[in-house]
């Protein structure tokens, strides 16, 4: 099965080799028919500490690296300040 890839914004990069990424998704509410935005935060493994707060990055699913880390940083998209 292919690994999931998501894009999100780095919320925190203070920990060593870890970036916390906020991923936003939109969907239509089944009853209200209104577009709803929902966000999740994921702990991603950042081997080279390249992530910077506010940066948009892609993360990929991987084998568990710690209690919370099940994602790894794949590529940087650009910076937003």
UniProtKB/Swiss-Prot annotation:
Pfam families named in the record: Ribosomal_S17
GO BP: any one term: translation
Record key words, sorted: Ribonucleoprotein, Ribosomal protein, RNA-binding, rRNA-binding
CC terms in the record's Gene Ontology section: cytosolic small ribosomal subunit
Entry superkingdom: Bacteria
A GO MF label: rRNA binding
Family annotation (InterPro entries): NA-bd_OB-fold, Ribosomal_uS17, Ribosomal_uS17_bact/chlr
Listed HAMAP family: Ribosomal_uS17_B
Subunit structure: Part of the 30S ribosomal subunit.
Family: Belongs to the universal ribosomal protein uS17 family.
Task of the protein: One of the primary rRNA binding proteins, it binds specifically to the 5'-end of 16S ribosomal RNA.
Protein name: Small ribosomal subunit protein uS17
Annotated source species: Hyphomonas neptunium (strain ATCC 15444)
Gene that encodes the chain: rpsQ
């Amino acid at each position: 099965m292919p690994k999931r890839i998501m894009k999100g914004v780095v919320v925190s990069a203070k920990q060593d080799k870890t970036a916390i990424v906020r991923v936003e998704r939109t969907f239509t509410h089944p009853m209200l028919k209104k577009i709803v935005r929902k966000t999740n935060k994921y702990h991603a493994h950042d081997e080279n500490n390249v992530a910077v707060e506010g940066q948009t990055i892609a993360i990929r699913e991987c084998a568990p690296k710690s209690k919370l880390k099940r994602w790894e940083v794949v590529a940087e998209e650009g910076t937003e300040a």
